[in-house]
Swiss-Prot record:
Its cofactor is NAD(+). It comes from Mycolicibacterium smegmatis (strain ATCC 700084 / mc(2)155). Homotetramer. This is Adenosylhomocysteinase. Signal peptide: none annotated. NAD(+) binds at residues 210-212, 244, 273-278, 296, 331, 352-354, 399. Belongs to the adenosylhomocysteinase family. Pfam families: AdoHcyase, AdoHcyase_NAD. One of its GO terms (biological process) is L-homocysteine biosynthetic process. May play a key role in the regulation of the intracellular concentration of adenosylhomocysteine. Binds 1 NAD(+) per subunit.
Length: 485
């Protein structure tokens, strides 16, 4: 691989596809700002206070137009920011360029934020970009904003290996990405044996966006390896019940349509997983007229699927009949090579969980099947018997690889939670131990209230007597922490 080097212009280091795309990106950012009332309200509320002044935020999250609005909100509240994408295919190159240039800069004289992201990165490029995002001139990063946990893992594993005095060798059967990750840490260790330890000691907290990253945080905490407090943004109601369900409901069919242009109506579809994301998948495809079946390990979710009108089957029972198969579990090895070989000729296979190991892409690549690239992020894999399947985005997030991800309004909910969580950990750090927390209910309700008003809804107001009768304050919060929405 050619050695990667950041570009530097007007004192800003960056690596994006093409800075000349910035004008297009800025136009889309302005449109997105109108559709992101939560972030814009937070800018108005906190701009004069500058609650993030002094924060050096390293962000690892899909570099989209919507994320650009998040980044510029953090900056407007006083933070310094460096950014990389958390997925090799999810970057929107015009958005990345616009963030580097900034609202008041030009491609010749950028005045924005350091971004290291472009669509179609290799694994080596991805982890190089992640390291650049975490590497600051002078003082190290002191906050992390994460999606999937890669930035957090890089800091914590790097510090762990520095303490041990060695980066372990990769095993032959390790995933390709893990081998690359260890290689990057090993190369850095040879040059600087304290880099990650210094960052881990400097970081005051991390806010995590998605289910997969939250699972990693809880695993680090259980092992006593979490070196700083964490806020689980994913399980805020205004994130998980909106982004995960309604966002997916919009973006899944967008990705399938852009990737394949097949008619969804009448097709047999198998959705693996019926959590919030799976529910959004099933609802959107059923709304297009597809005949949907669901796989589940959890009897409660399975019962929900049945009551919603979907068959519940195993992968083995349904795989041979499905025209479209979508994984949405957050687990690994959901679709194996044997499953892929059992699929119908030219069936479509895609994933909308965070990582690419829900579908065993490594086994497919080793199988001897012939890969034919149809167009970016659409590949036909032909098996020895002549049968083929269509795989979207190489088993990674198809809604971001084949389309542009969730729409701005629903991301305004999620990203408002991220901003509030960053402010919470930065300004009240002494109140948090090295554990995983959730945002307080009244903050969740605050985010919801902003978006209700933006959609023209009018909330009913409790009287004092009514509030006392059900044991809540007139201004909320209105539900206990254990309430399930």
């Amino acid at each position: 691989m050619t050695e990667l080097k950041a570009d530097v212009r007007n004192g800003i280091d960056y690596k994006v596809a093409d800075l000349s795309l910035a004008d297009f990106g800025r136009k889309e950012i302005r449109l997105a700002e109108h559709e992101m009332p939560g972030l814009m309200a937070l800018r108005r509320e906190y701009h004069d206070v500058q609650p993030l002044k002094g924060a050096r935020i390293s962000g690892s999250l899909h570099m989209t137009v919507q994320t650009a609005v998040l980044i510029e909100t953090l900056v407007s509240l006083g933070a310094e920011v460096r950014w990389a994408s958390c997925n090799i295919f999810s970057t929107q190159d015009h958005a990345a360029a616009a963030v580097v240039v900034g609202p008041n800069g030009t491609p010749e004289e950028p005045k924005g934020v350091s971004v290291f992201a472009w669509k179609g990165e290799t694994l080596e490029e991805y982890w190089w970009a992640a390291e650049q995002m975490l590497t600051w001139d002078g003082e190290p990063a002191n906050m992390i904003l994460d999606d999937g946990g890669d930035a957090t893992m890089m800091v914590l594993r790097g510090a762990q290996y520095e303490k041990a005095g060695v980066v372990p060798p990769a095993e032959d059967d390790d995933p390709a990405e893990w081998k690359v990750f260890l290689g990057v840490l090993r190369e850095r260790f040879e040059q600087d044996k304290t880099k990650w330890t210094k960052i881990a000691e400097s970081v005051k907290g991390v806010t995590e966006e998605t289910t997969t990253g939250v699972l990693r945080l809880y695993q680090f905490a259980a092992a006593g390896e979490l070196a700083f407090p964490a806020i689980n943004v994913n399980d805020s109601v205004t994130k998980s019940k909106f982004d995960n369900k309604y966002g997916t409901r919009h973006s899944l069919i967008d990705g399938i349509n852009r990737g394949t242009d097949v008619l969804i109506g009448g097709k047999k579809v198998l959705i693996c997983g019926y959590g919030d994301v799976g529910k959004g998948c099933a609802e959107s495809l059923a709304g297009q007229g597809a005949r949907v079946s669901v796989t589940e390990i959890d009897p409660i979710n399975a019962l929900q699927a049945l009551m919603d009108g979907f068959d519940v089957r195993t992968v083995e029972e349904a795989i041979g009949e499905a025209d479209i198969v979508i994984t949405a579990t957050g687990n690994k090895d959901i679709i194996t090579l044997d499953h892929m070989k059992a699929m119908k000729n030219q069936a479509i296979l895609g994933n909308i969980g965070h990582f690419d190991n829900e579908i065993d892409m490594a086994a497919l690549e080793r199988s001897g099947a012939k890969k034919i690239n149809i167009k970016p992020q659409v590949d036909q894999w032909i098996f020895d018997d002549g049968k083929s399947i269509i795989v979207l985005s190489e088993g990674r997030l198809l809604n971001l690889g084949n389309a542009t991800g969730h729409p701005s309004f629903v991301m305004s909910n999620s990203f408002s939670n991220q901003v509030i969580a960053q402010i919470e950990l930065w300004t009240k750090n002494d109140e948090y131990d090295n554990e995983v927390y959730r945002l307080a209910k009244h903050l969740d309700e605050k985010v919801a209230r902003i978006h209700v008003e933006a959609l023209g809804g009018t909330l009913t107001k409790l009287s004092k007597d009514q509030a006392e009768y059900i044991g809540v304050d007139v201004e909320g919060p209105y539900k206990p922490e254990h309430y399930r929405y």
